Amino acid sequence: MAKPAYKVADISLAEFGRKEIVLAENEMPGLMACRQKYGPLKILKGARIAGCLHMTIQTAVLIETLIELGAEVQWSSCNIFSTQDHAAAAMAKAGVPVYAWKGETDEEYMWCIRQTLIFPDGKPLNMILDDGGDLTNLVHAEHPELLKEIRGLSEETTTGVHNLYKMFREGRLGMPAINVNDSVTKSKFDNLYGCRESLLDGIKRATDVMIAGKVCVVAGYGDVGKGCAQALRGSGGRVLITEIDPINALQAAMEGYEVTTMEEASKEAQIFVTTTGCTDIIMGEHFLNMKDDSIVCNIGHFDCEINVTWLQENAVEKVNIKPQVDRYRLANGNHIILLAEGRLVNLGCAMGHSSFVMSNSFTNQVLAQIELWTNREQYAIGVHVLPKKLDEEVAALHLDKLGVKLTKLSARQAEYLNLPAEGPYKPEHYRY
């Protein structure tokens, strides 16, 4: 049986999606510069890219950039709640085989990913663009015969990168991979500034809660946690941090946050945000400690940070307030308000990150795909990062939009610093 040309929630939303894509393009200068620079060269001609990344308006601009560069593209979303149905419809209407809709079941989610493996002409994928590792894991586990044709993969997020390093250590990685997440222009921008705005958008749309004056817990103080803590503090919240890493804990303390354990924080706070990418962060004993109508949400990639299963099995009652907002009544009489079923709150309850910051991340994705497609022989099987020079190029492409005037090194200054006047300006180990 032939697979469908696409599967989306409502193709009639395509016109609405196209209007928003036009707006987003103006906010994504990095991707538009890639089209201008590489489009005429069709530098990705012959690439058959299977993408598994949140099917949003911003992702639509990424998809059409890859196509403009000569690639064939098929797409699924990497989260059951993150698809923006008008974006998916616009891509389907434009002829892109896209398999994504908001509110997929877990079974439908895996079905969607499987549809992207074989292209309409019967040929398999030869490139992967992933977010979280589900597509990568599926190919390795179920279709190892496809690995020999795949030139490489680029991975978007922290969770997926951890998965890649684990696969490589265990000898299971079958292709070169570029870790896009650890490009400075991704992790220090998308993870921090993106979450700083989109977290509050998700919480506010879901609950209309006043942040000011409330005690808020942020679990984890990496780049995502830093952005979330800044957002909550900026709205007047009193922010507590939980951490396992003494360096991150010290950073948080010296920014003026109280650093404590979830056992202690769960007795005091009213809003909980997990950002760790780890499992078992908020457990049954923590729910039992919480105040009535505590709000609990996650902004890490997978839904394993909050023990939703415990809530489902132990709550006396569950009331769905509206899509992705559930109120659980516990045996002690208190209620827990869970957002997006413990999945990404900024995409489940709002629209995700803004276009401008996603232009940083997605420009890195485009450059990673170009690197792997055109210079495959330079990349052994393993996990790689983009060169510093490309990282700086991504940043430079976004300066004009913000009216930034960059100082230029003189020849004497460049000689004094022993740097090329045109960069790169920092060593690979520099942390920013």
UniProtKB/Swiss-Prot annotation:
Keywords: Hydrolase, NAD, One-carbon metabolism. Its EC number is 3.13.2.1. CDD domains: SAHH. The keyword NAD applies. One of its GO terms (molecular function) is adenosylhomocysteinase activity. It catalyses: S-adenosyl-L-homocysteine + H2O = L-homocysteine + adenosine. GO terms for cellular component: cytosol. GO terms for biological process: one-carbon metabolic process; S-adenosylmethionine cycle. Its cofactor is NAD(+). It comes from the Eukaryota. Pfam families: AdoHcyase, AdoHcyase_NAD. Pathway: Amino-acid biosynthesis; L-homocysteine biosynthesis; L-homocysteine from S-adenosyl-L-homocysteine: step 1/1. SMART domains: AdoHcyase (SM00996), AdoHcyase_NAD (SM00997). NAD(+) binds at residues 157-159, 191, 222-227, 243, 299-301, 346. PROSITE patterns: ADOHCYASE_1, ADOHCYASE_2. Coiled coil: none annotated. Substrate binds at T56, D131, E156, K186, D190. Belongs to the adenosylhomocysteinase family. This is Adenosylhomocysteinase. The gene is Ahcy13.
